[in-house]
Amino acid sequence: MTVIHTENAPAAIGPYVQAVDLGNMVLTSGQIPVNPETGEIPSDIVQQTRQSLNNVKAIIEQAGLTVADIVKTTVFVKDLNDFAR
């Protein structure tokens, strides 16, 4: 098992890592919409989603993968009315 870390995504805020490479798959931790350069969180759900996905992209690229390699995602939203956006 290899720990994956990039400065292009927010650091883990608990006792975990951004991702681990298990050899035949990479598992990422949950990502939040924090801009790793500024520490800011956008107020709009669309921008929050974009930032969270950019964070995932940065982590998997650090592991040598692309978004085309992602086989499963789970999305959590605070307000289901925002889901369609």
Go through the PLM ranges and name each one:
Residues 1-85:
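Short, polar/acidic, helix-capping and beta-turn segments at strand->helix junctions
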